[in-house]
Swiss-Prot record:
Stored InterPro entries: Nucleotide-bd_a/b_plait_sf, Ribosomal_uL23-like, Ribosomal_uL23/eL15/eS24_sf
Record localization: Plastid, Chloroplast
Keywords: Chloroplast, Plastid, Ribonucleoprotein, Ribosomal protein, RNA-binding, rRNA-binding
Lineage, opening ranks: Eukaryota, Viridiplantae, Chlorophyta, core chlorophytes, Chlorophyceae
Keyword Membrane: no
Name of the protein in question: Large ribosomal subunit protein uL23c
């Protein structure tokens, strides 16, 4: 299913400000998605027109549980800019 590629929306103060000021929505998605795939995914799932896409991969953080160490799962963070007057309800 296509919705499985979207992990969750990012809910930080910075993402809320950009959502209301610039119509930019921030999501964490699967690492394997490319920008054209991300655009098609959001346009079909939410019925919006995506004007711009910015992506980056934040560094993985080290996690320690007892004596063993590991890393948190990697993800890709996406900032979507929508056409004026449109919004995503989540």
């Amino acid at each position: 299913m296509m919705a499985d590629f979207i992990k969750y929306p990012v809910t930080t103060e910075k993402s809320y400000l950009s959502m209301f000021k610039n119509k930019q929505y921030t999501f964490d998605v699967d690492l394997r998605l490319t920008k054209p795939q991300i655009k098609k995914l959001f346009e079909t799932l939410f019925g919006v027109n995506v004007i711009g896409i910015n992506t980056h991969r934040p560094p993985r953080k080290k996690v320690r549980a007892g004596l063993s160490t590991g890393y948190r799962p990697a993800y890709k963070r996406v900032i979507l800019t929508l056409k004026e007057g449109q919004s995503i309800q989540f």
